[in-house]
Amino acid sequence: MERTLTILKPDCVRKQLIGAVTDKIERAGFRIVAMKKTRLTKETAGAFYAVHKERPFYGELVEFMSSGPCVPMILEKENAVADFRTLIGATDPAEAAEGTVRKLYADSKGENIVHGSDSAENAAIEGAFFFAAEEVVRVD
């Protein structure tokens, strides 16, 4: 069973879409094994997205991710990383496939509702960033 990390971003929380997006995730066969609502500081958001530090959008991303509450979750499913990235769609909602989370709910490339890990290795690192091992609970 593979795991991936998602973050329902501040725009998702602000638009009161936590339930709608979580429902779509569960209906796609993902099991939520860790979940919490939190608010990232600029420092925490900067640390999480440090891999993008040299990219032109880094400052805007850090500002946005620290602008309000977010909901990180660890999801479990066979082929979780690839299947989740298919479920959420392209980063730019204008390019996202019909029926994907971003096509349905995102307003722009910068405010695109949801983060999804890009590899199993990064999913493990990102999951540990938000959750201690004892916070990850599998229910059979």
Swiss-Prot record:
Record EC number: 2.7.4.6
Keyword flag Nucleus: no
One Pfam family hit: NDK
Superkingdom of source: Bacteria
Residues engaged in binding ATP: 9, 57, 85, 91, 102, 112
Membrane-traversing stretches: none
Annotated family: Belongs to the NDK family.
Subunit (UniProt): Homotetramer.
Protein name per its UniProtKB record: Nucleoside diphosphate kinase
